[in-house]
Amino acid sequence: MEKKPYYITTAIAYTSGKPHIGNTYEIVLTDAIARYRRAQGYDVFFQTGTDEHGQKIEEKAKEQGITPKAFVDGVASTVRETFDMMNTSYDYFIRTTDEGHEKQVQKIFRKLYEQGDIYKGTYEGLYCTPCESFWTESQLVDGCCPDCGRPVKKAKEEAYFFRMSKYADRLMKHIEDHPEFIQPESRKNEMVNNFLKPGLQDLCVSRTSF
């Protein structure tokens, strides 16, 4: 009898610094689910990895006098060693600087652009470099990032956007038809009430100046 496929992934660890307890907590939980599904007879593919792009990485590398690639090589190695030390059973460890990953991203990006789902526009917002987060004026606390309290800077540039608004109705219907699609319930409510019902916004998918 052919096994039913089951794909599971962690979020990919950001490589601006050493792995932390949140990374290990997540990989252990995901590993437990993967092992449970294998025991149930599923053909499990368990993926994890590292996110190796961002302004914070560039700044950390500059502080150490090395290239961003050399910096993320060291952090990615530490992340993988940590996951291996915990005997997690992942099948594939992806790095966003891997040549294969870059080629696949470019292929998907071109396909989406050709079919009109990605377009060029202008992105403008208030950006916190340490948190790598954008905020609106109303979200700031005394003019600073609400998470870390540091100053933010205005950022405006040409960027590419994914036409997410095009799929709002389809997403809402899928969630209504498959109530278990987003779990736990609190996260489903957050997605529906905070994003879909107010009007799903197009997503910026590129950066050029930061």
Where are these regions (language model features)?
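Cys/His-rich short segments
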Residues: Q115-M172
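Short low-complexity, flexible loop/linker segments enriched in glycine and/or proline
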Residues: E59-E63, K107-I108, W135-S138
